[in-house]
Amino acid sequence: VRISERFSLEATQFELDFVDIDTDYDTPLFVDPFFLGCRTDLWSLNATRTLRSFFQTFVNFIRDDERRRARALFNYLHEPNETCLGLSRGKPRGNAIGSIDSEKLFNSIAQSKAVATGIVEDLEDFRLFIDGIDKDKISDMTTNIIRGHLVTYTQEQCKLWGIALQQNVQSGFYWERAANEWRNRHESMLVIEGRKILLVPKGIVSYSNKYTPQKYYNQFVLEYLQHEHLRNYSALVQHRVNGMPYVTKKSLKESGESAYSKDFLATFTDAHPEVFRDFKEWIQHTATAISNEELDDSDPAIIAQYLIRKLGQIAAGGEGATRYHRLVVGILEFLFYPDVVSPIVENEIHDGRKRVDITFDNAARGGFFYRLHTTYQTPAQFIFVECKNYSREVANPEIDQLSGRFSMNLGKFGLLLCRTVDDMDTLLARCNDTYVDGRGIMLPIIDDDLIVMLNKVIEGVPNPYEEFLSQRFRAVALN
C-alpha cells in the first residue's frame, strides 16, 4: 500500500515531493549521492555536506593507517530498512551491507589503491573503483549517513500532509558532522505497523544507471585509448577501404592491457586524472532529476484535468482553507518540479514572530527560478508562498504580510495565491510598489492562472510556468 493510499492523501506522485513508496515492497530506486551533490537547494546542500564530512573522516583514517577507527565508523553502515527502496524482493529487508560481507567489503575499501592514491574523491566513486560495491550499497551507505536529514524531511512532509507521527522514537544512527561522530536521538517518527518509515525526496533518487563504471569505461576510457593508439599508430590500428585509420573498442577490450576491471579503471585514472574529471563534468552537465513519469506511468494530461476539477470543488472561505492549501502545494509541485522542491507548511521565521504559509527550496539550474538570482538580481534561496482562500479582495495588508517575510538571507521572491480578484491591474500596481521600493518580487496567481498553466500541460507544452511567470513578472516590473 502506497503512502498516499494508506493516509488518504488524495494526491498522486506528481503532487508529492517524496517518493510515494509501497511500504509492503521495495521500490527499485536508489538514493543517489551524485544527484544529491548536483542539487542547489538548502536541504540537499546540507545533506551533501554531511555526506562529505563522513567520507573525508572515514577515508582519512584509512590513509593515515588508523584502520580500527575507520572500521568503527564503517560498522554503522548497516542495511537500512526505513526507505523501502532498493533491490530486495518481497517485503523490505535491506539487501546491501550485511554482516556476512561487511568485513570483506571494508577490507576491499581499506586495501584499495584508489583510496590510497586519492583517486576516490566522493562516496559514489567507490562504485567505480572497488569490487563488491554497486548502486545498492552506495544508496544504503548514503541513507545511513544522511538519516538525520531524512528524519527532518519526513517530519516536514508529514506535517504538510497531516500524517500523524509517533513521539519519542529512536531515530537510528546518523552522522553528526558538527561533532564528527555517529549519533542517535529520540524523535517524532512515521511508524507504520510497528516499523519506522523515512520519506525520501524524489529529486535525489535515480535508477543509478549513469554514474557507473561501465559508462566511464566505455564512453571515456576507451575513447581516450582509441585516440592514443591512433596517435601512436599501434598494432591495434586498422584501415577502412578509403585508407582512414581506426581502432575499435572491441579490440581494446580484448587486449590484455585494457580489458575491463575496476583495478584497471583505478590504474588508468591514476595515470590520466583529466579523463575522470571530464567524465564527472559530463555527468554533472547532463544529469537530470528523475521525472514524475519515470516514477508513475500516469498521463500528466489526465493529472492536470484532475487538478482542475479538484480546484473547482473547493469553496472559498475558512472552511476550505486547509484543502486549498494542500491542493496548491500539489499543483505547484506538479508544475514546478524539479526546479522548486521540499515544501514546508506554516514555516516560522524571525523566532516565530512571523509565519509564512508554504516555503519551497529553490533548486533550479536554469529557467525562471534560476534567473531570479542571475538576471533579476533577486536573492531567492527560498520561494515563499501565501495562500488566501478568500471570497473577498486581496489588498495591501496581504501584500505587506508576504513582503514582510523577505530578507537578503532568506530570499526576496514570493507567490501570492488567491481564488480570484476583481481588479488585477490594481493588484499588480501594488506589487509594483513593493518591487520599485526594493522590497522584493511578489507575483499574484489566481485560480484562472493555475488553470491556464494546467491546460498548457494538457496541450503538451513543456514547463508552461516559464512563460506565465516571465509574463507576470514583466507585468509587475513594468506596471
Task: Show where each model-derived region lies.
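Generic alpha-helix signal with a bias toward terminal, lower-confidence helices
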Residues: 41-43, 150, 157, 166, ...
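Short, mixed-charge, low-aromatic patches
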Residues: 99-111, 281-290, 316-317, 354-361
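Catalytic core segments in nucleotide and nucleic-acid processing enzymes
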Residues: 303-479
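Charged/polar, solvent-exposed surface patches and flexible loops
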Residues: 49, 53, 57-60, 75, ...
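The feature marks a conserved, polyanion-engaging helical scaffold used by nucleic-acid processing enzymes
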Residues: 175-344, 349-352
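Short hydrophobic/aromatic-rich motifs at helix boundaries and adjacent loops
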Residues: 119-123, 300-303, 374-375
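Terminal, charged accessory segments of proteins
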Residues: 1-252
